[in-house]
């Protein structure tokens, strides 16, 4: 009975942490940026137009762009887009970092390991924040783009994962205290 009660006390924090961590991982595939309404209308008018000279990227490819798509575009076309061939590698590393730390968060949530979960969440958040800062610093967010659904869902996911981790810590401490009292 005590073991069943302990498992029940961990269930809700576990589910919250797993859903939050899975959401963080999912966001690297969802639109990180989305074209503004006006820019989207222009894209729809000329979907086959080339977005960047000397590339095969069409404007329809950059209407809603995920972190993975940015990394792919920048790694294969960084000289044409960013004017430096090595910069694309940096974006790949950043997106892989976000994905890796989000995956680690999911693994630690599934293993019910709240401290490593918190650490991986903080690392994922740090890399994600750096990517957002870079986009704002380069002026991308002031022009034809808004943040996409992936950007906002990442914040929801990280809050859920952190809340789940804290609740796991509390539930585990309560469970240990109850075992000591019995």
Residue locations for each model-derived region?
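Compact integral membrane and secretory-pathway proteins
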Residues: 2-182
